[in-house]
Amino acid sequence: MKALAKLERGPGLTLTRVKKPEVGHNDVLIKIRRTAICGTDIHIWKWDDWAQKTIPVPMHVGHEYVGEIVEMGQEVRGFSIGDRVSGEGHITCGFCRNCRAGRRHLCRNTVGVGVNREGAFAEYLAIPAFNAFKIPPEISDDLAAIFDPFGNATHTALSFNLVGEDVLITGAGPIGVMAVAIAKHVGARNVVITDINDYRLELARKMGATRAVNVSRESLRDVMADLHMTEGFDVGLEMSGVPSAFTSLLESMNHGGKVALLGIPPAQTAIDWNQVIFKGLEIKGIYGREMFETWYKMVAMLQSGLDLSPIITHRFAVDDYEKGFAAMLSGESGKVILDWADA
């Protein structure tokens, strides 16, 4: 089958042919329709320090997808041939304390599709049936293909009650921009997002941001004053991994505020802990999606009117994958879709 793989220890990916995956007795085989390029895939493309330490070579990658079940293992129940599915990219052990307590998103033995094992940038993907998730007919293939990052945004944004609250989001990547739409959809009052990328800040405006602030030109304090915010933000969502953004977020929080961290900062990042302690802030780390509560919330929000369509900005046939990665690398894109229909 055709697949997009890391064949050598260096930058780039190669469209090549690999063996079709075998289907275990608890697995489903998915014929891929669409995939999306993730920030993780950009790290793999660049072959940065993280990728060099993490990604086996050779291996085909990718973990954002939608497709159709074409084969099932003999033990699989609850699915049928022809079901349209996406899937949870974190494969968990099922035996650790957190898994057995129903907290699979905290499994210490997690294996990542397209990171630690063969991925979805291929004509076919085999995953445990437990990880597959049926997509309702009213949700498009394009939106279903981005359920993985949409889930990151959902898990982060809905970690705290947002109704009537003022929310600060630092980092206008696709996940941060989707978090804007989620926060507004569930009833936040002011949703302010910061970045230095004007293209993505404009996407955030299209998704409903109260203010989208380029912090290289505009003061967040001035924006807060314009919005008559005299006490600070109630909820902060750190999506960038940039130390200066995290510092600004902590300085802008109200006493008793709640902060969710999805962005990954450098390991030795220093912060002013006085901002955390004396403000009584609550800080929560976010990794992946809650299985499968996050997935049900994603479907419910889309079915109740959440519009994520502006975040999908580019579409390419998989044979033009280099154009897709170029769009992502340019910084002037939202989500980029690769179509496998004619693969």
From Swiss-Prot:
Positions that bind Zn(2+) 1: C38, H63, E64
One Gene Ontology biological process: L-threonine catabolic process to glycine
Cofactors named for this entry: Zn(2+)
Record Pfam families: ADH_N (PF08240), ADH_zinc_N (PF00107)
Pathway note: Amino-acid degradation; L-threonine degradation via oxydo-reductase pathway; glycine from L-threonine: step 1/2
UniProt superkingdom: Bacteria
Primary role: Catalyzes the NAD(+)-dependent oxidation of L-threonine to 2-amino-3-ketobutyrate.
Protein name as it appears in the record: L-threonine 3-dehydrogenase
Species for this entry: Burkholderia mallei (strain ATCC 23344)
Source taxonomy: Bacteria, Pseudomonadati, Pseudomonadota, Betaproteobacteria, Burkholderiales
